[in-house]
Amino acid sequence: MDFKQYSPEELKECSMIEVVHSVLGDKRQATTFNELVQEIAQVLGLSQEQVNAKIAQFYTDLNIDGRFINLGENRWGLRSWYPYEQIDEEILPQPKPKKKRKVEDDGFDDYIEEDEDFDDADVTEDEDDDVEDLDKVLEDEDGDDDDLDDLDEDEDDFAEEELEYDETEEEEEEL
């Protein structure tokens, strides 16, 4: 779009987003955000102060508008230029190849699982003792429940005694 054909009044009515869309369409290549801002300022005749006042809203509008895409490294382009599959490839950062480390001998022999064969016959008496110990623990926990029941009964008895005391106290006050 040739902006020279528009009068200054018509250019002032154009939004920054419309100008960027036209600029990118004419260039046909991705451009950095700073270059886009400079071109907008030049086309619309904005001072540096005006640009600074509008730059935050412009960046927000650029992100929200679906016609534009951020290609990383602060480069912007038109979404219509990139098929969906290519967008993913451009946006994703390229992984850096990792340096290979020298394998050092740690002083231990490598353990191979295939050498060991475990059967049910390998079960030791220690495992049977563990089961018996677990049974004892469970029995002890049942005993703890009995202690809680005793506490509940004690609380009930205390509450009844307190009620009886309150009644006798009130009778004495009435006299």
UniProtKB/Swiss-Prot annotation:
Q: Where is this region: Disordered?
A: 91-175
Q: Which InterPro entries match?
A: Asxl_HARE-HTH, RNAP_delta_N_dom_sf, RpoE
Query: Where are stretches of biased composition, namely Acidic residues?
Result: 106-175
Q: Which Pfam families match?
A: HARE-HTH (PF05066)
Q: Which domain of life is it from?
A: Bacteria
Q: Tell me which GO cellular component terms the UniProt record holds.
A: DNA-directed RNA polymerase complex
Keyword annotations of the record? DNA-directed RNA polymerase, Nucleotidyltransferase, Transcription, Transferase
What are this entry's molecular-function GO terms?
A: DNA-directed RNA polymerase activity
| Any GO BP annotation | regulation of DNA-templated transcription
Domain HTH HARE-type, residue spans: 14-81
Q: What does this protein do?
A: Participates in both the initiation and recycling phases of transcription. In the presence of the delta subunit, RNAP displays an increased specificity of transcription, a decreased affinity for nucleic acids, and an increased efficiency of RNA synthesis because of enhanced recycling.
In the record, the note on similarity to other proteins reads:
Belongs to the RpoE family.
Subunit description: RNAP is composed of a core of 2 alpha, a beta and a beta' subunits. The core is associated with a delta subunit and one of several sigma factors.
What NCBIfam families does the entry give?
Answer: RNAP_delt_lowGC
Q: What is this protein called?
A: Probable DNA-directed RNA polymerase subunit delta
Q: Which species is this UniProt entry from?
A: Bacillus anthracis
Q: Which gene encodes it?
A: rpoE
